[in-house]
Amino acid sequence: MPEPSKSAPAPKKGSKKAITKAQKKDGKKRKRSRKESYSIYVYKVLKQVHPDTGISSKAMGIMNSFVNDIFERIAGEASRLAHYNKRSTITSREIQTAVRLLLPGELAKHAVSEGTKAVTKYTSSK
């Protein structure tokens, strides 16, 4: 009865060594794919509002999901509005209307005023 080779024991189920994202089979390193997030912007706003407060990575992940969700909702609503009015371009007007439709009361008013302020600042800096 032949004995199994002792140089490499059989790996347990599911414990196969996977090639990492940063390596190829021939050993050359590959550029890591960038993971885009809003974390630096969330952090900047946090420091403006509460300079002495930090944020955990879990909370940052939640904030990132929140920003992505709101972005998708506003973009979807603005797209629908442009389609209803037979327009092929989403302008600041569609975004503003989408914000008014999606956000409740006072929150919508503040969002619209901050958005208008940001657009004015951007156009004046050009």
UniProtKB/Swiss-Prot annotation:
Ubl conjugation recorded as keyword: yes
N6,N6-dimethyllysine PTM positions: K58
Protein name (record): Histone H2B type 1-B
N6-butyryllysine: residues bearing it: K6, K21
Residues with N6-methylated lysine modification: K117
Residue list for modification Omega-N-methylarginine: R87, R93
Record PTM N6-acetyllysine, positions in chain: K6, K12, K13, K16, K17, K21, K24, K86
Modification type N-acetylproline: residues: P2
Any single GO BP term: nucleosome assembly
UniProt KW Repeat keyword: no
Positions where N6-(beta-hydroxybutyryl)lysine occurs in the chain: K6, K12, K17, K21, K35, K86, K117, K121
Residue list for modification N6-glutaryllysine: K17, K35, K44, K47, K109, K117, K121
Record PTM Phosphothreonine, positions in chain: T116
Modified-residue entries (N6-lactoyllysine), positions: K6, K12, K16, K17, K21, K24, K44, K86, K109, K117, K121
Post-translational modification PolyADP-ribosyl glutamic acid, affected residues: E36
PANTHER family documented for this protein: HISTONE H2B (PTHR23428)
Compositional bias segments (type: Low complexity): 1-12
MF GO annotations: DNA binding; protein heterodimerization activity; structural constituent of chromatin
Site of covalent link Glycyl lysine isopeptide (Lys-Gly) (interchain with G-Cter in SUMO2): K6, K21
Keywords annotated in UniProt: Acetylation, ADP-ribosylation, Chromosome, DNA-binding, Glycoprotein, Hydroxylation, Isopeptide bond, Methylation, Nucleosome core, Nucleus, Phosphoprotein, Ubl conjugation
Gene: H2BC3
N6-malonyllysine modification, residue list: K117
Modified residues (N6-methyllysine): K47, K109
